[in-house]
Structure formats: structure tokens, C-alpha cells
Regions:
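Sec-dependent N-terminal signal peptides
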Residues: 4-17
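A signal for specific C-terminal beta-sheet/loop modules enriched in small/flexible residues
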Residues: 7-10, 65-78, 90-100
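Small side chains
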Residues: 11-14, 57, 147
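Non-cytosolic coordination micro-motifs
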Residues: 20-53, 83-178
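N-terminal, post-signal-peptide region of Sec/Tat-exported proteins
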Residues: 41-81
Length: 178
């Protein structure tokens, strides 16, 4: 009897050790199909426009568009883009650094790559002349979550905005289609 109990207990512990949690966006697991994800985001108050295939609403205090991106009809990434990319260089640096601090100070995440921007950084010059990309990426402290949260500065006609991504790396393209 002890032996059977030990085997059952060992099997349960082994399964738990290999189970993986899924990255979430607004508490919604990034998995399943696109229609389900859009429906769940609409339940959170976002509005879906079928013509543009985008949702709109507020995220982290900013009006944004949200794109649900799939691979083989499985959701793998949520892309968030500022609705109005109208920040000047000073304000986008402040916003970039604020996001960096928010993610760095969140107990769920750890920095994978990137750093805060210095006040003296001339992002306009660096982006145009040297094609520099300003981004930061964070992984999960809980290693059972195979996901990535990252963001970058986007420039359009001298105005700036933030592009942010929540990625379920288990659902990302892995070359199976090649």
C-alpha cells in the first residue's frame, strides 16, 4: 500500500514539475484562438473593429489599439500600440522609463534586456542616423511561464509612441511550416 501511495504521489509531483503556466494579458491567458481572445478582451471593456481587426480602449492609462496575433490559429502575441503617437522626445523618454520602472518593480518580472534612457540621450538622432532601436524585455521570475513582455519606442514623422508585446513563446512560430 505504501508503495502504491508513493508511486501516485511521485506521479503527481512529476506532473506538477513539468506543467507550465501560460502568460496572461489583463488576467486572460494568451492561448486559444483569436475569436475567443477578442471576446474575452471585449468582456474587459475593449471595443472590437472588425474592419481594422483591432480592439481599442485604455491600457495602463493610455488610449491604445490592441492586435491579437496568431500562428496556426493559436494566439501567440498581444500587440499594444498607442492610439495617438504624438509624444515628443522628452515625454517618450519619461514614458519609456516609467514603463521600465513599473515592470522592474513588479514581482512577476525580471529584466532580460534593456535599460532606462538617460536624459541626455538624443533618441531622434540615434534612431534616424544610426537606426538604433530602443527597447526593453522582461521574462517571468516563475520559469514555468514561457513568455516575454517587451516594449519599444516607435517613431513616425518626428513623433513617438510605445509598442508593447505580450508573447506566449510556446505558441510562437518555430519553423514547423518550413
Amino acid at each position: 500500500m505504501k508503495r502504491i501511495l508513493f508511486i501516485v504521489l511521485f506521479a503527481i509531483v512529476s506532473l506538477n514539475a513539468f506543467s507550465q503556466d501560460v502568460i496572461k494579458f489583463l488576467g486572460i491567458p494568451i492561448e486559444g484562438n483569436k475569436k475567443e481572445m477578442i471576446s474575452k478582451l471585449c468582456e474587459k471593456g475593449y471595443e472590437y473593429d472588425s474592419e481594422s481587426d483591432l480592439l481599442s480602449g485604455e491600457f495602463n492609462g493610455i488610449d491604445v489599439f490592441i492586435s491579437v496575433q496568431t500562428v496556426n490559429n493559436r494566439v501567440w502575441r498581444i500587440a499594444i500600440v498607442d492610439e495617438n503617437q504624438n509624444s515628443d522626445e522628452t515625454n517618450i523618454k519619461i514614458r519609456f522609463n516609467k514603463l521600465f520602472d513599473q515592470l522592474s518593480n513588479n514581482s512577476k518580472y525580471e529584466l532580460a534586456d534593456g535599460s532606462k534612457l538617460e536624459d541626455s540621450e538624443d533618441i531622434s538622432y540615434e534612431m534616424v542616423v544610426h537606426k538604433k532601436r530602443y527597447d526593453a524585455s522582461f521574462t517571468f521570475k516563475d520559469k514555468s511561464i514561457h513568455g516575454l513582455v517587451w516594449y519599444m519606442i516607435a517613431e513616425q514623422y518626428g513623433r513617438y509612441g510605445i509598442l508593447m508585446f505580450y508573447e506566449n513563446l510556446d505558441n510562437a512560430a518555430n519553423g514547423d511550416d518550413l
